[in-house]
Amino acid sequence: MGAILGKKIGMTRLYNDKREAISCTVIQAGPCFVTQVKSAEKDGYDAYQIGIGERDEKKINKPMQGHYRKAGVTPGFMMAEFKKTEFSENLEAGNPVSVESFKEGEKVNVLGVSKGKGFAGVVKRHNFGGGSRTHGQSDRLRAPGSVGGSSDPSRTFRGTRMAGRMGGDNITVKNLEIVKIMPESNLLVIKGAVPGPKNSYVKIVSIKK
């Protein structure tokens, strides 16, 4: 049981004992360190703040330099918080967090930000069918149709599906299986797809039994 931060490297495939191809995502989960321990007495809640990667100290501002220095760790690229209950052991600031806290075959949830698609119409964003392709139609092919009545109700209802910014949402993909663990290179190979583009950061959390 554990939790860790990771960087999405890309997708590949592995073959199981039956010679079946399995689509997998490779995640660089480390080096990770505890940068802060939060407690209910001081902060109002219990959590571990985890940082990932090693970054040049000159490329971060002074407050963040002090924050990393206090923990006694090298500055990282990103930090995220995890509940203490997601770890099977007590950690202190500066302790490493390794992929060895997971096991092959274990099920995890992966949290990330989905790919941003920019401003999208209703056909792409909500899978609308669009207008009829015949009977004199000239410019209604990908139009949304009516979005509110005339005199009644004289307004557009809140939540009506319309064109707008698509993607860039917080997504959790559940029950993904860890196919392979490579501790020497801090790699996790997870069955299936995880949210976000290449080189984006994700949170990997064990499923509580």
Swiss-Prot record:
Any single biological process term in GO: translation
Designated name of the protein: Large ribosomal subunit protein uL3
The protein's assembly and partners: Part of the 50S ribosomal subunit. Forms a cluster with proteins L14 and L19.
Gene Ontology CC entries for this record: cytosolic large ribosomal subunit
Protein family according to the UniProt entry: Belongs to the universal ribosomal protein uL3 family.
Region: Disordered, residue numbers: 126-165
Annotated Gene3D superfamilies: 3.30.160.810, Translation factors (2.40.30.10)
Domain of life assignment: Bacteria
Keyword Ribonucleoprotein: yes
Keyword Ribosomal protein listed: yes
Single GO molecular function: rRNA binding
Pfam families in UniProt: Ribosomal_L3
SUPFAM superfamilies in UniProt: Translation proteins (SSF50447)
Keyword list, A-Z: Ribonucleoprotein, Ribosomal protein, RNA-binding, rRNA-binding
Biological role: One of the primary rRNA binding proteins, it binds directly near the 3'-end of the 23S rRNA, where it nucleates assembly of the 50S subunit.
Source organism of the structure: Chlorobium limicola (strain DSM 245 / NBRC 103803 / 6330)
